[in-house]
Amino acid sequence: MSKSKTFFRLMRYMLRYKGLSILALLFILMTSIVATAIPLLAQYYIDHYITKNIAKAGLYILIIYFGLFILRVVFTFLGEYYFAKVAHSIVRDLRNDSFANLQKLGISYFDKTPVGSVVSRLTNDTQAVADMFGTIFSSFLNTILMFVVTLSAMIALSWQLTIYMILFIPVMVGSVYLYQKLSSRLVEISRAKISEMNTKLSESIEGMKIIQAFNQEQRLIDEFGEVNNEHLRYYTKSLKVDSLLLRPAMALFKVLAYGVIVMYFGLSFESAGFTAGIIYAFIQYTNQLFNPLIKLMQNFSILQTSIISAGRVFTLIDNEEYEPEQKESDYKISHGDIEFKNVSFSYDGKRDVLKNISFSVKNGESIAFVGATGSGKSSIMNLFLRFYDYDRGEILIDGVNIKDYSSKELRNSVGLVLQDPFLYHGTVESNIKMYNEELTREDVIEAAKFVDAHNFIDKLEDKYDSLVTERGSTFSSGERQLLTFARTIASKPKILILDEATANIDSETEELIQHSLEKMRKGRTTIAIAHRLSTIQDSNCIYVLDKGEIIESGTHDELIALKGNYYKMYQLQAGMLNK
């Protein structure tokens, strides 16, 4: 998206707050009018009182002068206050829109996008937009209004000299354009480096246990320092362009303008009938004309940063990598019979990770998929949960194509238990209910008892109201898994997907987990993905995957008798494989 399109799109956000924006604009206009009146009053005071040595009457002028000054301060405050309010309202909307679209995006987006990059867009980049509206935009409008009002007053004093002053403006604008061309790329890279630093920080915090366990602290420090230095290098370059080009140029134009004023009044003081008050007022108006322009141009780098940041936010808002589309039909999953018919799938559109996968499982039955890492086990789960769309073939539930079910019906009918149990910050009860207000405390307790989680919950100080910290770090891995079991059972699913549900459980806890799983599977269609073959021996059918294809299938005993890949895997895990 071009910078001009980004800017005008931001303006549409601003139109949501027309009332506040108009109010802020009125206060800025009043500030400009009052600011313009002050030099005129000073001119009148100089010409009518100081030059004539009349001090007494000048006291009233002085009171009016200070009154106008106070009004200017008040109007400036109110204008900036309401613009800041509009700015942060826009940022709130941008964050809400970004987060709302984030919830719609498919797993494919999150699989390839670093967490820190997303966080950076929702926090740093949106804050940069607030800086634009709260500071730069109000300054821009103030400059425009001040320019118009001041120019009118200058023309009234001397239209000839005003023309000379106006000639400086195109040169100033040209300088800003040159500055923009030189610094735009530097600012863009600088913002990208901030996003990269956030990614490094996020990954470091999430993987701190592994980092410390493998003595990788120094490597992470070096990598973060390298990115940080890169950010500093590009930011310093942009500062050089700002300091060496923009600021000196603006200061030079101002000095030249003063020189023109002095020369003009010096040459035509007597013939044009200029007074000391007029000269003073004109110098003040020149300041009022140039100072806001200089300030605005000096802040142009902030404007550039804000536009670039807004473009990054809009990229997130406009992202349409949504999960596969589902029909809003009235189909209901009644039994949970599942069938895959010659299903093939590729993540990149080039290399198939699943090739002609076919299997079926009836209600109450349990099947399992085993195989080496990368064999396609998790891909089958991703397709069934509609995280990705398959390329060829067909997936049926109760004889109906999976695409014909609504997303709500599919999600409500499928219970998912992952290898790494995820608990939210809240209470034990809220984690089991998952904020489903239809579930009562009794439903929660019933689900916990069903999966043998009630015993350890009941021993907690606040029982079901006990606080769960982020990721449930105060619970053991087995306790976290039992809580996710209770969460799954509380939703009363017809189909269970178990993705390495016992992979991170110790042997002692595994027995309890296995007992819970047996009860969970009864009366439900179950698909399990497992590395521990001991956990799936009672499955109705076990499928062995290799490079995206089913190479063996059968019960545990049948596969052992076959003495193929499954047999070797089983022997290896049992520690009985001959070297």
Which residues fall in each region the model found?
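An intracellular "coupling" helix at the cytosolic face of ABC transporter transmembrane type-1 domains
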Residues: 16-19, 107-108, 124-133, 137, ...
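ABC-type nucleotide-binding domain
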Residues: 325, 331-579
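Transmembrane helices of ABC transporter permease
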Residues: 16, 20-33, 64-71, 135-189, ...
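Membrane-integrated ABC transporters
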Residues: 1-35, 50-61, 79-83, 87, ...
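Alpha-helical segments in transporter systems
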Residues: 19-40, 61, 65, 83-84, ...
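Helix-loop-helix
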Residues: 53-57, 153-167, 241-311, 316-317
